[in-house]
């Protein structure tokens, strides 16, 4: 009987395939998986890729999968002994195995509320969206579904569409405002397959942003709602909590490849607005790389080298001096000493 139930679950139609990359997520992954399984009014599967975890994540996943056939552990060839390959490779493995009409991103340390999937599917049907996203609610301790979202909440719900130039502009590094790259969209699986969309394996931070750029460049209709149903956990466990130089370099190389070839290159050739937005985004990455090099130099005691790097790029200098002044203000009343940030603020997740 148990085998028949499992076989039925493997062949039954699926509305949404949740793609979950997990690395050392043992404290949170059960909450994340159960939140996906508890979606109301939709048939789901949860495809979980354990990416070289060493903290018991695999044991938690095995226990949950044994109890519910909708949970599908997806193998991933390791880069080495317990060496994680990164979220992009893990997402690609899950994406290749997905059976749902839609695919949805759910990080292993996040969660979603029970009516999220049904609500977003209804909105997608009403707006003919290929990508649909809601308003993430950041949290650090206990999740409050009524908490403040990243986007403004109004008395009346609202929707807006996201164009390619707008998406590039709002996701520039080191600029104020909401980064739409933090959104965790659901995507029509047939659109993804039709255009051969995949994650860039080398990118560990900003992978969802790049995936959405590729989708928009292929003509996807991207709709965002003020409805808030995704709980986004902030904290050191999040890959996007900090950006290191290597992260930015990989993101820059991947974006450059997009900009110089494929669908995005065609948009840049035809649209001055997209050319400008693309250049501005890459310029922000260049500034972020300089800042990361300054931080590395300062951490190694090479202060003069760091100062020279910053002075050579005025935007980097302004950002760093502003950060130091803000840090000094927080230490008012105490002895001040120079302090460098140990990493950059997070960019698109």
Model-based region annotation:
Residues 2-3, 210, 217, 222-349:
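C-terminal subregions of glycosyltransferases and related glycan-biosynthesis enzymes
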Residues 2-246, 335-336:
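Nucleotide-sugar donor-binding/catalytic module of glycosyltransferases
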């Amino acid at each position: 009987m148990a085998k028949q139930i499992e076989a039925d679950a493997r062949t039954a139609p699926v509305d949404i395939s949740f793609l979950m990359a997990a690395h050392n997520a043992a404290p949170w992954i059960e909450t994340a998986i159960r939140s996906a399984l508890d979606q109301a009014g939709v048939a789901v599967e949860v495809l979980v890729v354990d990416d070289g975890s060493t903290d018991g994540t695999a044991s938690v996943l095995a226990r949950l999968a044994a109890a519910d056939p909708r949970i599908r552990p997806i193998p991933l060839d390791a880069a080495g002994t317990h060496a994680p390959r990164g979220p992009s490779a893990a997402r690609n493995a899950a994406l290749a195995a997905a059976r749902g009409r839609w695919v949805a991103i759910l990080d292993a340390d996040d969660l979603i509320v029970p009516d999220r999937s049904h609500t977003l599917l209804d909105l997608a049907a009403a707006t003919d969206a290929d990508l649909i996203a809601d308003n993430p609610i950041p949290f650090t301790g206990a999740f409050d579904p009524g908490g403040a979202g990243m986007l403004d909440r109004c008395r009346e719900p609202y929707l807006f569409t996201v164009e390619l130039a707008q998406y590039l502009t709002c996701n520039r590094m080191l600029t104020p405002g909401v980064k739409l790259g933090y959104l965790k969209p659901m995507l029509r699986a047939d659109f993804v397959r039709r255009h051969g969309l995949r994650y860039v394996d080398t990118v560990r931070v900003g992978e969802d942003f790049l995936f959405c750029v590729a989708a928009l460049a292929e003509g996807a209709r991207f709709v965002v709602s003020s409805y808030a149903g995704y709980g986004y956990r902030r904290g050191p466990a999040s890959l996007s909590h900090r950006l290191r130089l290597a992260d930015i370099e990989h993101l820059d190389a991947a974006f450059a490849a997009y900009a110089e070839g494929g669908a995005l290159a065609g948009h840049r050739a035809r649209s001055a607005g997209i050319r400008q937005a693309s250049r501005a985004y890459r310029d922000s990455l260049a500034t972020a790389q300089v800042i990361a090099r300054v931080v590395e130099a300062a951490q190694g005691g090479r202060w003069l080298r760091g100062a020279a790097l910053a002075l050579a790029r005025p935007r980097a200098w302004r950002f760093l001096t502003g950060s130091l002044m803000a840090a000094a203000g927080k230490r008012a009343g105490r002895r001040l000493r120079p302090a460098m940030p140990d990493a950059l603020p997070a960019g698109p997740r």
